[in-house]
């Protein structure tokens, strides 16, 4: 079930104005803020549907973000990437990359993030850099996000990185690299 809500709804009052969509596993309802403009509104529906199908039924946690917050950036970026790819295929369009000032993304001022996404742009920039380092397409991140049992998706990603680290003599551990990619824009 998909339900659109306004600023008087309990979801808005509990979660605030920054939340565009919310998946409630108990009621099996996806809540979407009704004031979102298109195409973002439709994309948020696909985004939340994707979260619903990547949820571990044993613990209601989503994607590779099972044991800690390490996978959150990757999970949200690849979920938005998936949602926008679905939207693009349905409507037969593609989105151009944009340069977005970091102050528009609740980041430190005077930077620029490059992304074609309409949400989670700063995470998408990190995902793009990680894809280049690993030599994988962004669709790889979508595929590992369903490997949530025993953190297999995150382990697979870290293993790929460790292989590349040894091959290219990279100086950083996987977690330090994620931190660097998150803060360098």
Which ranges hold each PLM region?
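Auxiliary, metal-adjacent structural segments of Zn-dependent hydrolase domains
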Residues: 1-30, 34-38
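Low-complexity, repetitive regions of proteins mediating host interaction that are extracellular
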Residues: 15-18, 67-68, 178
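Active-site-proximal structural scaffolding
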Residues: 38, 72-76, 120-123
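A generic hydrophobic-helix recognition signal that picks specific residues
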Residues: 40-44, 69
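Short, solvent-exposed secondary-structure capping/transition elements
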Residues: 42, 55-64, 87-96, 138-140
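Active-site recognition of the HExxH zinc-binding catalytic motif
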Residues: 43-60, 76, 80, 84
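Post-HExxH zinc-binding segment in Zn-dependent metallohydrolases
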Residues: 65-115
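Pan-zinc metallopeptidase signature
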Residues: 105-185
């Amino acid at each position: 079930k998909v339900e659109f809500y306004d600023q008087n709804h309990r979801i808005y009052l509990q979660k605030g104005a920054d939340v565009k969509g919310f998946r409630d596993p108990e009621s099996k309802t996806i809540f979407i803020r009704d004031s979102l403009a298109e195409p973002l509104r439709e994309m948020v529906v696909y985004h939340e549907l994707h979260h619903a199908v990547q949820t571990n039924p044993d613990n209601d946690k989503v994607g590779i973000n099972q044991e800690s917050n390490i996978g959150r950036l990757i999970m949200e970026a690849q979920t938005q990437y998936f949602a926008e790819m679905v939207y693009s295929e349905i409507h037969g369009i593609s989105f151009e990359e944009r340069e977005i000032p970091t102050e528009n993304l609740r980041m430190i001022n005077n930077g620029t993030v490059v992304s074609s996404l309409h949400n989670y742009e700063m995470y998408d920039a990190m995902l793009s850099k990680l894809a280049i380092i690993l030599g994988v397409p962004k669709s790889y991140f979508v595929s590992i996000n369903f490997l949530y049992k025993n953190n297999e998706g995150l382990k697979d990603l870290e293993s790929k990185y460790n292989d590349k680290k040894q091959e290219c003599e990279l100086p950083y551990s996987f977690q330090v690299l994620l931190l660097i990619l998150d803060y360098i824009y």
